[in-house]
Amino acid sequence: MGYVSREDALFKKEVIRTADVAQSSQLWLLDEGHCFRDQMVRFCQMKSSQTSQLAYNLGSMETFMRMVESGMGITFIPELAAMQLCDSQKELVRPFAIPVPTRQLIMITNRNFIRQALLEVLVKEIQAGVPKAMWKLGAGQVLV
């Protein structure tokens, strides 16, 4: 999901298209190597030259959110994070147009994994924190 400052041109849009991202005044991205950053760069089909000219790289999503709230640019946040925002922050959230980027969590172990029961408990705990509607890909969603 896009987190867009009121001063950015994208704030007036109801949904964000990948082509719109390049029109933003400032794009705040996590440092290279963060999987969320890499997935969003791939999804928006940004080249490394674009990210170096357009984006500011730091290590904290919270810092980016404060920058956006103070009127500076756009960043991306996971949908689960958007659910935890207060009303004034939710006003800054813009969903992506179809296709919607979606992330998938997969647990893979060796067939003889000794802590299989522990892994099953972990999976149940993760699922308890994620709305059931997010457990499967929906129409218009694409894995990033």
Please give the residue ranges for each predicted region.
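Secondary-structure junction motif
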Residues: 11, 25-47, 115-119, 123, ...
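Active-site-adjacent beta-strand anchor residues
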Residues: 3, 29-30, 57, 75, ...
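Structured helix-beta-strand junction loops
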Residues: 13, 23-25, 70-71, 88, ...
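A bilobed periplasmic-binding-protein/Venus flytrap-type ligand-binding module shared by bacterial periplasmic
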Residues: 3-9, 104-115
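Flexible hinge/capping segments at coil-to-helix
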Residues: 1-27
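Generic preference for hydrophobic
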Residues: 2-3, 27, 93, 107, ...
